[in-house]
Amino acid sequence: MKLALALCAAFLLVVLVQAEQECTPGQTKKQDCNTCNCTPTGVWACTRKGCPPHKREVTCEPGTTFKDKCNTCRCGSDGKSAACTLKACPQK
């Protein structure tokens, strides 16, 4: 059980996504709230943190819920703001 938990924790901490863009080994960059490092083979490997969404204008009926990708949002009392879950949605 401890081994399974340790493996899950390690997996969550070290989940990497390789971008299609080529790079120079050793380079680093930020992508939203994630950090990317260029691997020795010249491809980007980035963490996959669930970044807070960028603020944007919304128009919704106060108190209602709606989906934003895989996240659920609740419309604020002003009808112009919403609070959403921060799941890391799988890319399609």
Curated annotation (Swiss-Prot):
Keywords: Cleavage on pair of basic residues, Disulfide bond, Protease inhibitor, Repeat, Secreted, Serine protease inhibitor, Signal. This is Serine protease inhibitor I/II. Pfam families: Pacifastin_I. It comes from the Eukaryota. Residues 1-19 form the signal peptide. GO terms for cellular component: extracellular region. It is found in: Secreted. One of its GO terms (molecular function) is serine-type endopeptidase inhibitor activity. Residues 20-54, 57-92 form the Pacifastin domain. The keyword Signal applies. The keyword Chloroplast does not apply. Belongs to the protease inhibitor I19 family. The record marks 48-49, 86-87 as: Reactive bond. Disulfide bonds join 23-38, 33-51, 36-46, 60-75, 70-89, 73-84. Expressed in hemolymph, ovaries, testes and fat body of adults but are absent in the gut. Also present in larval hemolymph and fat body. SUPFAM superfamilies: PMP inhibitors.
